[in-house]
């Protein structure tokens, strides 16, 4: 989750809004991470499944709202999600995608035109980029942003509530903070329940099954300085991990760090 120096492609195409990023992805002008682009706009994780599994997955998300906050669901076979974006096409409007067959990653295409099916249902799931913007606006430093690396993520011993074939441990992201900033972060992120909300754990990583903070399961390791404590949030990698573990016959998702940029504003997600 790196912050980009400018909100434009090398070719000068603006990436200031969610629609700008979608159109740049559609044209092939944007092929990498969306972090730092479309500031102020909500970015979403994608989980795309056959309709026969959609109800079970929706129940899984409803039972596990911290790691799986749903912000949009499509009709079967419909690649649009007008509730979160004008002229949005799920098949083309993300810089890169993942294709899973029987739980195994088999391709990482630039678009889903060759992989789209009429029985597919898209779930857009809230992303921590939204609350990170609020933390940075409050002058709370984020080490992974400062270092230009991906946030470290870990599988825990916290079991998600199962639904149908979907079950498994919660994945969390970790951000080191001073105790004072951790308290402020709880206050700030509590106002964003649709993008993971408040931390689920602070300190003592071993209490949630994490043995070594220098060896994340996903993302990149970051240093924890003297006087800092690890702060853990439920993470949107959880649904992808659970889908893969379920070994369902066919599923699609966004590529790592390549989110769906919506027309929703981060400020509109805040409560209270």
Swiss-Prot record:
Gene3D superfamilies per record: PSTPO5379-like, PSTPO5379-like domain
EC id: 4.2.1.-
Keyword Lyase: yes
Molecular-function annotations in GO: lyase activity
Enzyme class: lyase
InterPro entries in the record: D-Glu_cyclase, Putative_hydro-lyase, UPF0317
Keywords: Lyase
Nucleotide-binding recorded as keyword: no
Cystine residue pairs: none
Coiled-coil residue spans: none
Signal peptide segment: none
PANTHER family: D-GLUTAMATE CYCLASE, MITOCHONDRIAL
Family the UniProt entry places it in: Belongs to the D-glutamate cyclase family.
Protein name in the entry: Putative hydro-lyase AZC_4080
């Amino acid at each position: 989750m790196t912050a980009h120096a400018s909100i434009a492609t090398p070719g000068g195409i603006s990436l200031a809004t969610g629609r700008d990023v979608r159109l740049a992805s559609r044209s092939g002008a944007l092929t990498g991470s969306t972090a730092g682009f479309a500031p102020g706009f909500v970015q979403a994780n994608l989980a795309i499944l056959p309709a026969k599994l959609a109800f079970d997955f929706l129940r899984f998300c409803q039972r596990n709202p911290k790691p799986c906050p749903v912000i949009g669901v499509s009709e079967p076979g419909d690649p649009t999600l007008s509730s979160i974006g004008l002229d949005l096409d799920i098949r083309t409007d993300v810089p890169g995608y993942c294709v899973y067959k029987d739980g195994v990653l088999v391709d990482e295409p630039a678009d889903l035109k060759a992989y789209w099916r009429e029985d597919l249902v898209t779930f857009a799931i809230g992303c921590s980029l939204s609350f990170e913007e609020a933390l940075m606006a409050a002058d709370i430093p984020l080490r992974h942003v400062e270092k230009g690396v991906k946030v470290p993520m870990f599988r825990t011993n916290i079991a998600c509530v199962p639904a149908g074939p979907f079950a498994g441990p919660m994945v969390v992201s970790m951000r080191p903070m001073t105790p004072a900033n951790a308290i402020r972060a709880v206050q700030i992120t509590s106002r964003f329940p649709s993008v993971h909300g408040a931390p689920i754990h602070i300190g003592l990583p071993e209490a949630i099954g994490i043995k070594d903070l220098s060896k994340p399961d996903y993302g990149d390791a970051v240093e924890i300085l003297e006087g800092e404590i690890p702060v853990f949030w439920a993470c949107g990698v959880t649904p992808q991990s659970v889908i893969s573990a379920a070994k369902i016959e066919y599923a699609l998702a966004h590529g790592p760090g390549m989110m769906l940029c919506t027309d929703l504003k981060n400020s509109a997600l805040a409560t209270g």
